[in-house]
């Protein structure tokens, strides 16, 4: 029996995602999802020993392709998908 180790499929519809290496956290959130133009907001945070939630360090917008590349790069580097690490603000 052949068992393949395929990566999970990238969703075609917008979805939030979280990655962590245990100290740093990335939150991927779709902000523009039109047929020909998709962007995600990526927020980076870092856990500090005396804090209840990660310290938010940086926020940037990436194209869908850039976000997918970053996600795959982090997974290859040992990061893991995780549950939400903070309550992100609601979309307007």
Model-identified regions with their sequence ranges:
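Terminus-proximal functional modules
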Residues: 1-92
């Amino acid at each position: 029996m052949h068992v393949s180790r395929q990566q999970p499929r990238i969703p075609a519809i917008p979805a939030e995602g979280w990655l962590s290496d245990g100290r740093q956290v990335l939150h991927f959130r779709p902000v523009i999802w039109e047929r020909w133009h998709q962007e995600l907001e990526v927020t980076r945070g870092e856990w500090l020993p005396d804090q209840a939630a990660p310290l938010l360090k940086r926020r940037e917008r990436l194209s869908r392709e850039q976000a997918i590349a970053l996600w795959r790069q982090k997974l290859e580097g040992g990061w893991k998908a995780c549950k939400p690490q903070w309550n992100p603000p609601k979309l307007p």
